[in-house]
Amino acid sequence: MATTASSAANSASRFSIDSSISRSRHGDSSPWLLPSDSHDHPTLSLSQDDPFSAPSVSPPTGNNSSDYDNADKKPPPVWNMPSSNSSSDVGPVMGAAESWPALSLSARSSSIKSPSLDASKPFPDGSSSSIPPPQATSNTSTNANAGSSVSATSSENSAVNNSQRKPFRRNNNTSSSSTSSNVSNAAPLNTRDQNHSQRGGGSFGSGNFRNSQRNRNSSSYPRGEGLHHGNRRNYEHGNQSGFSHRNYSGRDMHLQPQRGVGMIRPQMLMGPPSFPASSAQYMAAPQLGSYGGPIIYPDYAQHVFMPHPSPDPMGLVGPFPLQPMYFRNFDAILYNKILTQVEYYFSADNLSRDEHLRDQMNDEGWVPVRVIAAFRRLAELTNNIQTILEALRSSEVVEIQGETLRRRGDWDKYLLPREPSRSGPAAGASNNASLVSQIESMTLSERSREGV
């Protein structure tokens, strides 16, 4: 740091001498000469040749204060004073950059082009700068005041940023020259902007340095390396499948393993409608389409489906609906009571005592159902003949024939004997006598009517 400070002091002294020589050529009279009335504030100096250069601020010292003790003596110009060695150690004072140039000088300086930096001047540490300093078009002399104003700050930052500025000679020569030309053609800047850049710790080339840094960062990856600028595979923008935009030509494809014929996935198709549970179920095998999916998207479903054969000629016909079964509304308890009561009527114990039921039997032992339904106990349960017949179908004692009932097995044991019919001449004579008497009575009645 001591070496850097010494170099900065020597440079400041050299620039101050050069500025004195330059002023001797143009004269000492300048509207920028400001008499110093106070010893407490720093002195602001601007160059007449270069109104755009940063002002040089020098702090008050003990030697300078002795020069102004004599009030009768005219104070010397501000920039005729040699720069002190302490100027390299003391930074700019707040508020010193708020001075504005006179309107007449501002109007005259608008026609002067901005100088460019001299690329041949070395930095205090011996390294050459890649940014050319501004040069005046009408005068070949360098801007001494600009160098002296920024030497203190640039000497400290040049050693740190030297390694960062060297790459610009290789990559950004064009951008540096274009930046210099743009600066020379731009409108004149005021001292506020220049001092603002000086406060930030940078010189006139700090803005170019930042711009070139962005340019270098944007082009830090050469073509053919890193991210594949022109034909890079867009892996980081949602294209995680591994297929680049160049796959339409059929090159550089990363296809998945084949899963079937034609590089497509087997598609499960719905089989025919299901049949009733009694018949065997038919399961259709997975069918493969005749056309595969697109090569670019192997997982994309196929568009053409081949129909599969039906299991039988009626394969596309749905199952017939089952007819609902008709269940008669019956009461199991009622049927059980009817069955028990009728079986009691035709039991052996009841038939041996019940001559009325036996008298209703025909020669084959059949008894009409309406006779049984007329019984008091059965009539209390139901008077419906069909209900009685339905309840007796599961009986093991009574058998049914139409609407007649009889006992199973030994029904002939319970038949009553029949009385023989009356026959002979006596019977015939009596019948004839009765017939003759009837005829005679009729004849007599007719005669009596005629006589009257």
UniProtKB/Swiss-Prot annotation:
Domain HTH La-type RNA-binding stretches: 328-417
Q: Where is the composition biased (Polar residues)?
A: 44-68, 237-247, 435-445
Under the heading InterPro entries, the entry gives:
La_dom_prot, La_HTH, WH-like_DNA-bd_sf, WH_DNA-bd_sf
SMART domains, sorted: LA (SM00715)
Keyword match Nuclease: no
Compositional bias segments (type: Basic and acidic residues): 225-236
Which positions bear N-acetylalanine?
2
Keywords, sorted A to Z = Acetylation, Cytoplasm, RNA-binding
Predominantly, its location class is cytoplasm
One Gene Ontology BP term is:
leaf senescence
Q: Where is the composition biased (Low complexity)?
A: 1-22, 99-117, 136-163, 171-185, 206-223, 422-434
Q: Which domain of life is it from?
A: Eukaryota
Give the region (Disordered) as residue ranges: 1-251, 419-452
Q: What does the protein in this record do?
A: Promotes leaf senescence.
Protein family per UniProt? Belongs to the LARP family.
Q: What is this protein called?
A: La-related protein 1B
Q: Which gene encodes it?
A: LARP1B
